[in-house]
Amino acid sequence: MPIQPTEKIWRNGQLIPWEQANIHVMSHVVHYGSSVFEGIRCYGQPSGAAVFRLPEHMQRLIDSAKIYRMTLPYSLDELCAAVVDVIENNGVAPCYIRPIAMRGYGEIGVNPTGSPIDVYIANFPWGKYVAGGHGGADVCISSWNRLAPNTMPALAKAGANYMNSQLIRMEADINGYAEGIGLDVNGLVSEGSGENIFAVRNGVLYTPPLANSALSGITRDSVLTIARHLGLPVVEQSIPRELLYIADEVFFTGTAAEVSPIRSIDRILVGDGNPGAITKQVADEFFGIANGLKPDRFGWLTPVKVDSVEPVNV
């Protein structure tokens, strides 16, 4: 999906014009992928706009940086305030927010410690991510495995990890699928190229544990919280790929994907091919909270002030 530019980007504590947010070609991140990032959504609401689970996202950015021995020069509160600042200055909501911390221009070589750390935060309009919409996506099991836990840390949302995601997504696209599902090194279900995955079987909601090379998704955690609140039985356990074929319902979760039903896997229909009752129940609660149509019972929303907000469209 093409990027729609806004006016300002936050860089190292200052708002600068969008077109000036450039980096040098010899920056460490360009050569070695030394970055960590986040994806966050700001939702339009009847009374304005709000960022969904902002502190949790920015804490994960800090955690990802720590795993890669990057000490960010900003506190959690400062980073959260910067997100609000850039949204309110650009006046764009709903929107997608992309904070990124990277090793900049300084030294060449694999050891990154001599290169400075730069932090950017951008926001821009962005719609649905997974093709298929409310009717469900046609996806496949990828021939590419997710990264082994002793090679790349899955708990870090690092730019370099997404080279693996690109292989999964491109393979799916070439073969006519909306998305691919990666297995871990033991052949168990891990996640999509950029989404966590859930399956429903006989009324029980299953999702792979983080030990299956899955990212600790904020939306994943939100869905687990919602499901337990709704009284749904939830099990975090390893899932063989064939369970996805015989599941009653399967759906993706993620900041970009939100809650996205899956219609078929490897051209095998999931259930009757339509979004199932539990998927709808969870999605209704998720979007209801995010769009301000239901109470913020879990304290997930950070209000922002913008002059114009697009109407809520769930």
Where are these regions (language model features)?
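Short secondary-structure junctions
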Residues: 88-95, 232
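Active-site loop/lid in soluble adenylation, ligation, and acyl-transfer enzymes
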Residues: 104
